[in-house]
Amino acid sequence: MTLRYLTAGESHGPALVAIAEGFPAGLAVDFEAVDRDLRRRQKGYGRGGRMKIETDAAQFLAGLRGGLTTGAPIALAVWNKDHENWKDLVSPYARGGRKFTQVRPGHADLAGALKYGLDDARDVLERASARSTAVTVALGALAKALLSTLGVEVCSRVVAIGPREIRPDAPPTPAQRDAIEASDLHVDDEALAAEWRALIDAEKARGGSIGGAFDVYATGLPIGVGSHVHPDRRLDARLAGALCGVQAIRAVEIGDGTQVGRPGYEFHDAIHHDPARGFWRETNRAGGLEGGMTDGMPLRVRAYMKPIPTMLHPLATVDLATRAATQARYERSDVCAVPAAAVVGEAVVAWELANALLEKFGGDAVEDVRRAVEAYAARIR
């Protein structure tokens, strides 16, 4: 069986919950590593007041015993501390409070309210909120645990805030990863981070918001994960879909995908082989993916995040109830959440990679999967 999951919960409800199925038995789960990723998601220069309230941690309810997966479905919850301040407004048992009708451009408010026949966009924005990515990150941490067992590591780096973008072509080194994790902008260049902070400060001062981009990397993937056979099995399509499913992500680039103005001999990666290394490339312009499959080079995927639509200086809109012109309603929000989005990006990429590896190598016990990967790697050398 491959991986699947469902989540439920609202931004200010009691909890965000998930049920995940398909993890092989015997996988060791480091609970502190799960919570560490949740804390990483809360960090970042430009975040709003919500992050000062929440201290996210995952509570596992089923599917593990003694820190090991049992092969049964895994249930977990991330509790919302802020629910106490909103319980009269978002209670499952009663409806109260002012209706949210001043729908915000750039959000799900208007389309969701019209689609579901709602007179209060609160029911849309509570579920559409990026707060739901807390449980996504917890699920991604489980996928990372499986990937690590199979020799695959996933990390990320912010590469743009506003118009200031960089194009590193290789995964960060261990020292660079340490610097990235220590940075409030998730980057290993402090001079660049200072420029970005100034951009964020400027937007905050004028009541706006600012977007950017991040790269997600994966190392240790064998050649041939994914498939060329059907579009829905192509790993690049699955990764792009997973990243575009994250709130506010508007575009995805695989490798040097936007650099298509180059001639072919400057865009593709020549193939080499030697007995010790197997197949290898001098360059990685493809970002580790060719024909819908991994090519043995590090995976490199870039996601572009739009500016957060909720702004202190709002745009014009229409009131859902009266159809009269008005200003969009302000809800507590971030000025910039690109560093947090990078952590979410790691999670969804890790999930898709873990799923693709299980599709190829199967196994109800984690040791069976590991041995299958090792045997395959030896065969294709």
From Swiss-Prot:
GO terms for biological process: amino acid biosynthetic process; aromatic amino acid family biosynthetic process; chorismate biosynthetic process. It catalyses: 5-O-(1-carboxyvinyl)-3-phosphoshikimate = chorismate + phosphate. FMN binds at R127, A128, S129, Q247, A248, G291, K306, P307, I308, P309, T310, R332. It comes from the Bacteria. Its cofactor is FMNH2. One of its GO terms (cellular component) is cytosol. It holds the Pfam family Chorismate_synt. Keywords: Amino-acid biosynthesis, Aromatic amino acid biosynthesis, FAD, Flavoprotein, FMN, Lyase, NADP. NADP(+) binds at R41, R47. GO terms for molecular function: chorismate synthase activity; FMN binding. This reaction introduces a second double bond into the aromatic ring system. Homotetramer. Belongs to the chorismate synthase family. This is Chorismate synthase. It comes from Anaeromyxobacter sp. (strain K). The gene is aroC.
